[in-house]
């Protein structure tokens, strides 16, 4: 095979696409600007660096992203293989040691005979077959060219990353180990709050100083990664029904449910670092320290990485992409990752998997690959190419609402999800036989 594919961006989507192509014998130029040029959110030169949470979310098949992960496992996903190898305790979720995770992916691709890594910034779309997977922090020059080629105005909103703290600095006498509803292993440290403690914390959040943004950038948040101070502005109960909800987290010492709970999730394999679940923030660093130290057990906590915020860019996919993540008017170009309107680590990798397999099949004259809508991976591809509300196209997580209804209605939600999951995997196995 003499044709070489260019993949711009070695994040989750670009790395997955590169692997799928390379495994099928296609030569790949994997172009990544880091470390030559860093982004405001990245900290390393590794591929597929996790810049927000270290969790790939739920692993159960009663969870949309759990179904998507299982589909990807069965399709030889590099990202899911790396996640399984780098797993750390997280109850029913699949969380990873972020360094082991990205390290495994980086080594796999750098050592692959069909992958050539090029570290440079790209300011224009390369000639030939190209997958653009530059993510939410696409550089200005490349973003302008993408706008020109798609014919659409650029859309953007803000993503936020939660602070990471040292376990040794947590007052373990004030916290307890438990997963919500005791699902899976007890993997979260829980900081219980009385009503008085919550009110003091809430008032401090409202008064805390927020980092400035450029005037021309209108803040537009995706609900799944909203700063907790923005949630707080929506009302006192928003946090209590969001990241601080106490339901299913009764204190084992007292047997009683706290008024509010802040959860801490293990962030590394050694168990020395924890992130504050749902506390992605845009507060100034000094304000972050003051607010976090009002949480019981964290009065003297050491913060090893403060929360940060960065812009997130995505295109109006339903108008410009098809289910193969190809640009409709110039199908030598594909997009993959968050900029297509899939939201989340796993979803981004899945889009890269679909784009990579499709391009390999095209170059090998094996026909197109359209995964069934009954599969989660197929339903995501269908969503980004068919969502009709173009004026307000929003990023989407994997969820059962994207799948077609079952022939026979099942009232119980858990049973319905199980049936949809079983159907998805059955359809996937049948479709795999055609690949």
Curated annotation (Swiss-Prot):
It comes from the Bacteria. Its cofactor is FAD. GO terms for molecular function: flavin adenine dinucleotide binding; tRNA (uracil(54)-C5)-methyltransferase activity, 5,10-methylenetetrahydrofolate-dependent. It catalyses: uridine(54) in tRNA + (6R)-5,10-methylene-5,6,7,8-tetrahydrofolate + NADH + H(+) = 5-methyluridine(54) in tRNA + (6S)-5,6,7,8-tetrahydrofolate + NAD(+); uridine(54) in tRNA + (6R)-5,10-methylene-5,6,7,8-tetrahydrofolate + NADPH + H(+) = 5-methyluridine(54) in tRNA + (6S)-5,6,7,8-tetrahydrofolate + NADP(+). Keywords: Cytoplasm, FAD, Flavoprotein, Methyltransferase, NAD, NADP, Transferase, tRNA processing. One of its GO terms (biological process) is tRNA wobble uridine modification. InterPro entries: FAD/NAD-bd_sf, MnmG-rel, MnmG-rel_CS, MnmG_N, TrmFO. Belongs to the MnmG family. TrmFO subfamily. Catalyzes the folate-dependent formation of 5-methyl-uridine at position 54 (M-5-U54) in all tRNAs. HAMAP family: TrmFO. This is Methylenetetrahydrofolate--tRNA-(uracil-5-)-methyltransferase TrmFO. It comes from Staphylococcus haemolyticus (strain JCSC1435).
């Amino acid at each position: 095979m003499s044709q070489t594919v260019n993949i711009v961006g070695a994040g989750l989507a670009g790395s997955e696409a590169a692997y799928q192509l390379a495994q099928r014998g296609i030569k790949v130029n994997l172009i990544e600007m880091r470390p030559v040029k860093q982004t405001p959110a990245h900290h390393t030169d590794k591929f597929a660096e996790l810049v927000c949470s270290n969790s790939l979310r739920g692993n159960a098949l009663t969870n949309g992203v759990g179904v998507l992960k299982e589909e990807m496992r069965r399709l030889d996903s590099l990202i899911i293989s790396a996640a399984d190898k780098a797993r750390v305790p997280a109850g029913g979720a699949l969380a990873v040691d972020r360094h082991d995770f990205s390290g495994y992916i980086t080594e796999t691709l750098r050592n692959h005979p069909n992958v050539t890594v090029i570290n440079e910034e790209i300011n224009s779309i390369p000639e030939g077959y190209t997958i653009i997977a530059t993510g939410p922090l696409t550089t200005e020059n490349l973003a302008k060219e993408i706008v020109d080629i798609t014919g659409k105005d650029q859309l953007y909103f803000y993503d936020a990353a939660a602070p990471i703290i040292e376990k040794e600095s947590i007052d373990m006498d004030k916290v307890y180990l438990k997963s919500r509803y005791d699902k899976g292993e007890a993997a979260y440290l829980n900081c219980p709050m009385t009503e008085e403690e919550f009110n003091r914390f809430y008032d401090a959040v409202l008064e805390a100083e927020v980092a400035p943004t450029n005037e021309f950038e209108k803040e537009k948040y995706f609900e799944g990664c909203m700063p907790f101070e923005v949630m707080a502005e929506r009302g006192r109960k928003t946090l209590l029904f969001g990241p601080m909800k106490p339901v299913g987290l009764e204190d084992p010492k007292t047997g009683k449910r706290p008024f509010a709970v802040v959860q801490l999730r293990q962030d590394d394999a050694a168990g020395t670092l924890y992130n504050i679940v749902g506390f992605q923030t845009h507060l100034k660093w000094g304000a972050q320290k003051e607010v976090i130290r009002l949480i019981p057990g964290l009065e003297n906590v050491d913060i090893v990485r403060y929360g940060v915020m960065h812009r997130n860019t995505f295109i109006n996919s339903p108008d410009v992409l098809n289910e193969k993540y190809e640009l409709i008017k110039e199908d030598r170009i594909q997009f993959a990752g968050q900029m297509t309107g899939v939201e989340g680590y796993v979803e981004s990798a899945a889009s890269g998997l679909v784009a990579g397999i499709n391009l390999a099949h095209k170059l090998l004259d094996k026909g197109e690959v359209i995964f069934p809508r009954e599969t989660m991976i197929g339903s995501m591809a269908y969503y980004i190419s068919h969502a009709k509300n173009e004026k307000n196209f929003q990023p989407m997580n994997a969820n059962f609402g994207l799948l077609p209804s079952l022939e026979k209605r099942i009232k119980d939600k858990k049973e319905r999800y199980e049936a949809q999951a079983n159907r998805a995997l059955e359809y996937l196995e049948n479709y795999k036989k055609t690949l």
